[in-house]
Amino acid sequence: MLLLVGFLSPNKNLFLDEDSRQLKIAVVQPVENNYKILNNLTLQAKNDGAEVIIWPEAVSSYQNFQARTEFADIDIIGGFFIQQDEKIFTSIVNTSTNDRYDKRNLVPFGEFQPFDNLLKNLNEFFNIPNSSLTRGEKSQKKVLIQQIPFSGLICWELSFNDTFVDRTRNTAFIIHISNDSWYGKYMPAQHLLHAKARAIESQKWVVRSTTDGISDIISPYNQKKLSENIPKGIKSFKTETISTNMKNTTYLIFGDYPLLIFSFIIILLALINKNK
């Protein structure tokens, strides 16, 4: 098993895409979701040559964004609230095409209230707001940018293996947007390390935009050669040229199933040995 894992490791370059494309992309870190700040940083990134600019999670309602005209000629992918009938989603949106992915792993109590129906009458009695976001469907189409499919992940969805594998399989790179401002001092750095691990795991670039840090563009091949990330609390942007990679690593093909099967075999052998 260990020999097989070593043979299939990313260092063997088994998962490099011969038809890879280059894309100059930027992440924006506004610290606060203010359109004046976003506009300033976005224009700087565009002037720096960025073809696509990534905004963080939950910038504003998408209807509010669509009412503005200063971003009409810029390819922006960002996090917005989408109101559809009586439902509200938090989504990644390609603002050039209006294609979107709705977050499906919502944060309990922060984005939705567990046992909502059971607690509705109690909330009304104590005058507690009862609004929750709506969970996105499990099966959603991939969002494209310049006809390139990417994996869109919002906040802690990066940590859900099944969501990560499902959204990242058969895509060219990963966009991760988040608002880590409420996590405290240490969690943003841990979130960034997890993003770096996902880059290596999938052999795809991770483009990570957060509200107030830590934002970065992460290479799966040699992370040391890239410029510094944007530290927490700093208004800035970062631009890098990334390479697309449509190939799937072993993990993206099989997910956690090999580990689960191996664990089951170990437990089964232990039980058999115990009963001898």
Locations of regions flagged by a protein language model:
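Internal/C-terminal transmembrane anchor helices
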Residues: 1-14
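Soluble catalytic domains of enzymes that build or remodel membrane lipids, polysaccharides, and related
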Residues: 12-254
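Selective detector of the "anchor" transmembrane alpha-helix that sits immediately C-terminal
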Residues: 251-276
